[in-house]
Amino acid sequence: MNHMPAVRRFQAGDAPAATAIIRGLPDYFTDDVPAKVEHDAASHQAWVLTDSGTVAGFAVAATKSPSGAEILWIAIDATRRGRGHGTRLLSHVLNHLAADGISVVEAKTLDRSSGYRPYEATRAFWERNGFIHIDTIDPLPGWPPGNPAAIYVAAIRHSGSASGVLAVGPHWLA
């Protein structure tokens, strides 16, 4: 039976699965990240993507102002990458944020000036999903030295339709 991936709210019992996803992506996360994700998931809005009943990804978003939010974490299990799961999860998160009145979303990732190749796909993911690179901060407070942060933003809005379809990116501003 083919099960469609589903997104639901992160629950306390999902922390071990999130940790396993993080540990399975050693090129992307440092050893202190599982504790940070667990803390952030308990303190902010968080979701998991399940595939055939198994947690295959997670996302955490923090509301920064009445109209702004930041995607703090998003990750998909290494064995399930490239199947559209990240886009599905991000779309769900952005739709939820837009329905809550958020109009600008920020994401941070490792900047291309770092020369670290694994993050090329990460930056491409944000750009493919309507995010625009607006700045590089080095050093970013809280990040290890030598890890320039690429700051990405996207303008979002809820369509107002019953389906809640989201408009992302600069094209809807015209």
Regions from the PLM with identified roles:
Residues 87, 111-135, 144-145:
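Conserved active-site alpha-helix within GNAT-family acetyltransferase domains
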Residues 139, 146-148:
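Class I S-adenosyl-L-methionine
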Residues 66-68, 104, 149:
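A generic structural signal for beta-strand entry/edge sites
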Residues 74-82, 110-113:
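A short, internal acetyl-CoA/4′-phosphopantetheine-binding micro-motif in the GNAT/acyltransferase core
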Residues 5, 9-73, 77-79, 90-92, ...:
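Acetyl-CoA-dependent GNAT
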Residues 97-118:
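Conserved GNAT acetyl-CoA-binding A-motif
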